[in-house]
């Protein structure tokens, strides 16, 4: 059956700031306390969506979350009106204010793990929300992510959206950033590759930085998504590269159809994994980048592998890269050699995503891949699909509500909270989502 990969990109939120919240993510730590530009960040993301849509790659948008997230501050013991809560936390414990104001939901590669209908036992598309258990600021995302996905994939005959796994370290799940799918045409059954960093009873694990994904979580997600057990492989990421800042697999590998583009040090027991994939995926091609050409350190600093690998109708592929790759002489030299070599990659598209990159999120972090048949695509909420009208409407919306300068101190401004709620109220109408945010459901309006 014919099917297409639709990229659902996260829209950067109004409180995008640099707080260094993500230990193990070296870009996040390095840019801590810099001044951010939320308006520019949102526009950089929108431009990527629009240019890819114009190039023929189906594209949609997932909205940001409500931030600062006052309900969690109340759970932490701050009381009074919303304004009083903000004032108290800013004075007494500003680190909590930064955490509940994080715009991290924009990295929707961590929103959920997807199983296309061709891979599932019941023939539905399955989406399991990630619990993002390893980082407090990200663990707050799951309930609203679930509401948003249910508003976008709202036809229960075609889509099953599952709640996140329990919030315990044993079941730490980071979503599609640790998941690849390999195979032929998108509509054919594919091989799902789940990548984990640690498992109970296995001493092979990183020592410097945390392994965020567990094998136990990956196995549970595969069960929830009803993936045919014959179409699943579980593989461990190389713990040494996690200790070098590869906090998700999508920082060291990316797949599309029959191609796996990865660093030669990406996986534990890599040669064994690739042999398994060759045996189980027709036409499988591994493009392994040698450390002699691109070091792990350079891969992390340029986000070479946090790229998007997209298929054209003729079978050729486009690699979507951040500008940092072009600015690194060694990485750019390698990429031009890759273009000239015998493989399906025939074009490089480069985007300026500096605002997101400075927090450790490249092109692949910003998108959630969902393979859909034509019938399934028609069942998606049409208001989120990117086109000229939506692009212009969202740019106008960003111009109206977003600030062009934000520091950690600005997060205590009650006006920022009001602006954010008014903006999201408007956005839910624009995207025909209904009341998906807690402040809307509580009848709090814009106050």
Curated annotation (Swiss-Prot):
Transmembrane segments: none
Positions of the catalytic residues: 174, 248, 365
GO molecular function annotations of the record: N-succinylarginine dihydrolase activity
Gene3D superfamilies, A to Z: Succinylarginine dihydrolase
The enzyme's E.C. designation: 3.5.3.23
Domain of life assignment: Bacteria
Keywords noted in UniProt: Arginine metabolism, Hydrolase
Annotated positions binding substrate: 19-28, 110, 137-138, 212, 250, 359
Top-rank EC class of the record's enzyme: hydrolase
GO biological process: arginine catabolic process to glutamate; arginine catabolic process to succinate
Pathway: Amino-acid degradation; L-arginine degradation via AST pathway; L-glutamate and succinate from L-arginine: step 2/5
Keyword field contains DNA repair: no
Disulfide bonds: none
Catalysed reactions listed for this entry: N(2)-succinyl-L-arginine + 2 H2O + 2 H(+) = N(2)-succinyl-L-ornithine + 2 NH4(+) + CO2
InterPro entries: AstB_sf, SuccinylArg_d-Hdrlase_AstB
NCBIfam families: arg_catab_astB, PRK13281.1
PANTHER family in the cross-refs: N-SUCCINYLARGININE DIHYDROLASE
Subunit text: Homodimer.
UniProt family annotation: Belongs to the succinylarginine dihydrolase family.
Role, per record: Catalyzes the hydrolysis of N(2)-succinylarginine into N(2)-succinylornithine, ammonia and CO(2).
Protein's name according to its UniProt entry: N-succinylarginine dihydrolase
Organism of this sequence: Escherichia coli O81 (strain ED1a)
């Amino acid at each position: 059956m014919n099917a297409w990969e639709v990229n659902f990109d996260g829209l950067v939120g109004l409180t995008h700031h640099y707080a260094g919240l993500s230990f193990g993510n070296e870009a996040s730590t390095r840019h801590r306390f810099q001044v951010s530009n939320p308006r520019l960040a949102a526009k950089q993301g929108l431009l990527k969506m629009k240019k890819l849509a114009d190039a023929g790659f189906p594209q949609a948008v997932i909205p940001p979350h409500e931030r600062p997230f006052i309900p969690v501050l109340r759970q932490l013991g701050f009381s009074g009106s919303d304004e009083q809560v903000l004032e108290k936390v800013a004075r007494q414990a500003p680190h909590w204010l930064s955490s509940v104001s994080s715009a991290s939901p924009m990295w929707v590669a961590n929103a959920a793990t997807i199983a296309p209908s061709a891979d599932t036992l019941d023939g539905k598309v399955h989406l399991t929300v990630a619990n993002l258990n390893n980082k407090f600021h990200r663990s707050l995302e799951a309930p609203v992510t679930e509401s948003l996905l249910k508003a976008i994939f709202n036809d229960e005959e075609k889509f099953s959206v599952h709640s996140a796994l329990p919030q315990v370290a044993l079941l730490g799940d980071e979503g599609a950033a640790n998941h690849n799918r390999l195979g032929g045409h998108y509509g054919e059954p594919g091989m799902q590759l789940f990548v984990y960093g640690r498992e109970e009873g296995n001493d092979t694990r990183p020592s410097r930085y945390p392994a965020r994904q567990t094998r136990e979580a990956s196995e549970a997600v595969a069960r929830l998504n009803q993936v045919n057990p014959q179409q699943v492989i579980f593989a461990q990421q190389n713990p040494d590269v996690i200790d070098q800042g590869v906090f998700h697999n999508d920082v060291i590998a990316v797949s599309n159809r029959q191609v796996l583009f990865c660093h030669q040090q990406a996986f534990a027991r890599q040669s064994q994994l690739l042999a398994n994939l060759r045996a189980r995926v027709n036409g499988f091609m591994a493009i392994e980048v040698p450390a002699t050409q691109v070091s792990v350190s350079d891969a992390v600093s340029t986000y070479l592998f946090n790229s998007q690998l997209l298929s054209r109708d003729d079978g050729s592929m486009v690699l979507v890269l951040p500008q940092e790759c072009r600015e690194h002489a060694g990485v750019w030299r390698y990429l031009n050699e890759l273009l000239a070599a015998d493989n399906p990659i025939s074009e490089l598209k480069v985007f300026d995503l500096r605002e997101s990159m400075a927090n450790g999120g490249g092109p692949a972090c910003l998108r959630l891949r969902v393979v859909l048949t034509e019938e399934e695509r028609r069942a998606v909420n049409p208001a989120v699909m990117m086109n000229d009208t939506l692009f212009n409407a969202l740019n106008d919306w960003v111009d109206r509500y977003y600030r062009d300068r934000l520091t950690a101190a600005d997060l205590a401004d009650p006006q920022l909270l009001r602006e954010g709620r008014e903006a999201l109220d408007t956005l839910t109408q624009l995207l025909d989502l209904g009341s998906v945010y807690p402040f809307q459901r509580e009848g709090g309006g814009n106050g």
